[in-house]
Curated annotation (Swiss-Prot):
Lineage: Bacteria, Bacillati, Bacillota, Bacilli, Lactobacillales
Thermal dependence of activity, per record: Optimum temperature is 37 degrees Celsius. Exhibits high activity in wide temperature range (10-50 degrees Celsius).
Gene: bsh
Induction (record text): Constitutively expressed. Exposure to TCA and TDCA has little effect on the gene transcription.
Protein name per its UniProtKB record: Conjugated bile acid hydrolase
Keywords: Hydrolase, Lipid metabolism
Binding annotation for taurine: N81
Organism encoding this protein: Lactobacillus gasseri (strain ATCC 33323 / DSM 20243 / BCRC 14619 / CIP 102991 / JCM 1131 / KCTC 3163 / NCIMB 11718 / NCTC 13722 / AM63)
A Gene Ontology BP annotation from the UniProt entry: lipid metabolic process
């Protein structure tokens, strides 16, 4: 499972990140990929990185396999679980930009600074069902990609092939597909952050008992559909705040409200599904903020001249 979130502040600065909700941790950590680091591809020519990247992931055979990452220009991407729907190509297609599905993270962050350019380039992309190596399965993912101006959702499904959606809500969770989630929001148009008022029912005064009545019916469980509704509702209605400290707090307040608490969800294997980490990237200061289920202290990591020009991967 997972929840992705993005918004901009009153100055147009981007805050973008996610919850990672899984049944285990993978030994993930913050990784900085510097400029001029070797970047192999399965179907394209190998190259080196042009832009420094920061995010959370694991290193596999020297390759930074990111769960979410952000380049030095402020473009970010996060991959979220998309089970039962994701279906990638069985092999490369002539005339297409063929990428193993895991390669899209660094392909996007290395080649683009704006979502509008990513959207155009994706028209010629073929995502191939190819794992990073024989020890890993292909993850059934969809992606949210964002800069300070807009966000898109990229899905490759059995039914529709590749689809790219504009994400005006700044939210993504898991299956079903993004268009289904947008349709489902129609069930919640009666929600309002303002409290309900007293009414007269055939002469009988009926009054609310306390605050929060306008949002009565807002979901609070952990299924993807309900996390989508709640995160979208909070993202739309959270007041604008000023300054990085307040906006990072806003970000974590929203995502922690849809976090999966250990013990509340047990999967069919008998394992707890829970929010392993929450992360937020501030594009203005090139700062990656994160905390973990077992360590709530907010940690910060930065892209700066030293880290962006390092001679090897930096892992924390």
């Amino acid at each position: 499972m997972c929840t992705g979130l993005r918004f901009t502040d009153d100055q147009g600065n981007l805050y973008f990140g996610r919850n990672l909700d899984v049944g285990q941790d993978y030994g993930e950590g913050v990784i900085i990929t510097p400029r001029n680091y070797p970047l192999p591809y399965k179907f394209l020519d190998n190259t080196t990185t042009k832009k420094a990247v920061i995010g959370m992931g694991i290193v596999v055979d020297g390759y930074p396999s990111y769960f979410d990452c952000f380049n030095e220009d402020g473009l970010g991407i996060a991959g979220l679980n998309f089970p039962h729907f994701a279906k990638f190509s069985d092999g490369p297609i002539d005339g297409k930009i063929n990428l193993a599905s895991y390669e899209i993270m660094l392909w996007v962050t290395q080649n683009f600074t704006k979502v509008s350019d990513v959207k155009e380039a994706l028209k010629n992309v073929n995502l191939v069902n190819e794992a990073i190596n024989s020890s890993f399965a292909v993850a059934p993912l969809h992606w949210i990609i964002s800069d300070k101006d807009e966000a898109i959702i990229v899905e490759v499904s059995k039914q529709y092939g590749m689809k790219v959606f504009d994400d005006k809500l700044g939210v993504l969770t898991n299956s079903p597909d993004f268009n289904w989630h947008l349709t489902n929001l129609g069930n919640y148009t009666g929600l309002d952050p303002h409290d309900a008022t007293a009414q007269s029912w055939n002469g009988q005064k009926v009054a609310p008992w306390g605050v929060g009545t306008g949002s009565l019916g807002l979901p609070g469980d952990s299924i993807p559909a309900d996390r989508f509704v709640k995160a979208a509702y909070l993202n739309v209605n959270y007041p604008t705040v000023k300054g990085e400290k307040a906006n990072v707090a806003k970000f974590f307040n929203i995502l922690k409200s849809v976090a999966m608490i250990k013990g509340s969800v047990v999967n069919k294997l008998g394992s707890d599904e829970y929010t392993v980490y929450t992360a937020c990237y501030s594009a203005a200061t090139k700062t990656y903020y994160c905390n973990f289920e077992n360590d709530f202290e907010l940690k910060t990591y930065k892209l700066d001249d030293e880290t962006m020009n390092a001679d090897k991967l930096i892992t924390y």
